[in-house]
From Swiss-Prot:
It comes from the Bacteria. It comes from Pseudomonas syringae pv. tomato (strain ATCC BAA-871 / DC3000). This is Urease accessory protein UreD 2. The lineage of its organism: Bacteria, Pseudomonadati, Pseudomonadota, Gammaproteobacteria, Pseudomonadales. GO terms for cellular component: cytoplasm. UreD, UreF and UreG form a complex that acts as a GTP-hydrolysis-dependent molecular chaperone, activating the urease apoprotein by helping to assemble the nickel containing metallocenter of UreC. The UreE protein probably delivers the nickel.
């Protein structure tokens, strides 16, 4: 039976938790903690780049997040370890009669590196998605974090007409605020089509990478030629590079982020970019 767009789906809610820890042992990063509750877990760790970088793929078997669901993810990357976390596909926030929540707590210890590189988040019309991310960097810890959000499902003729998407992101280094952002997007809000908002685009994406690069590399990134219509730019803040873009499709936005990541990763993290194989499936 097909339900009209305004009808909420009533399903049992889940409270899922995932705790991950990583440590450096000689020249190898190894998982030191893996605890899960409910339908949230990681697949076997991989070493596509060799033993220094431990890659985990976070999976949520239900395939989507509905009203009343809550996902809590906690990650601690120990001193001098390197963890790269991604996902096998898009996270889908379904239409619902009540809010659903995701909370991330990410800690990166001195000398450690965390790459948080999930695939896109799709927010259905009538969804009530509320996300909170807190990241604490200690000492000279390094971070590469990105987020791709797609509102509605234009390919299916669904605009983001009802519901809301709410996001809160804090990044601190040794307790000092490095980046703070709050956003709340309401279905059918005028900012969705306004030139000072999303300007009719349905996808927005952000990449945050700690460190400083010279103006030449920034210009190289700004002048990237993309085969699809993506509007993006970069800003160098003290100790943090911010890259943002607007696009019509999540695939295009993610392709732009990947090209930026490929150029900035060697300069700031000291390793050539190797795309996780899961992105090609």
């Amino acid at each position: 039976m097909n339900l009209p767009a305004h009808t909420a789906l009533f399903t049992p809610s889940w409270h899922a938790e995932l705790e991950l820890g990583y440590g450096r042992f000689y020249d190898c990063t190894r998982p030191t903690q893996r605890r899960h509750k409910g339908p949230l877990r990681v697949q076997k760790h991989l070493y596509a780049e060799g033993p220094e970088v431990c890659q985990h793929i976070i999976v949520h078997p239900p395939g989507g997040i509905a009203g009343g669901d809550r996902l809590d993810i906690s990650v601690n990357v120990g001193a001098h370890a390197w963890a790269q976390l991604t996902s096998p596909g898009a996270a889908k926030w379904y239409r619902a009669a009540s809010p659903a929540f995701q909370q991330l707590e990410l800690h990166v210890q001195p000398g450690a590196t965390l790459e948080w590189l999930p695939q896109e988040t799709i927010v259905f019309s009538n969804a009530q998605a509320e996300l909170t991310t807190r990241i604490e960097l200690h000492g000279d810890a390094r971070l590469c974090y990105w987020d791709v959000v797609a509102l509605g499902r234009p390919a299916s003729g669904e605009r983001f007409e009802h519901g809301h998407f709410q996001s809160h992101l804090d990044i601190r280094r040794d307790g000092t605020l490095l980046w703070h952002e709050r956003q709340r997007i309401i279905g059918a809000d005028g900012l969705l089509d306004s030139p000072i908002g999303l300007d009719g685009k349905t996808v927005f994406a952000t990449l945050l990478l700690t460190g400083d690069v010279d103006s030449d590399l920034l210009e190289v990134c700004r002048s990237l030629s993309m085969p699809s219509p993506v509007r993006g730019n970069l800003t160098q803040l003290p100790g943090l590079i911010v890259a943002r873009c607007l696009a019509d499709e999540a695939l295009h936005a993610r392709a732009w982020l990947i090209e930026i990541w490929k150029r900035l990763r060697p300069a700031l993290l000291g390793r050539e970019a190797v795309m996780p194989r899961i992105w090609n499936t």
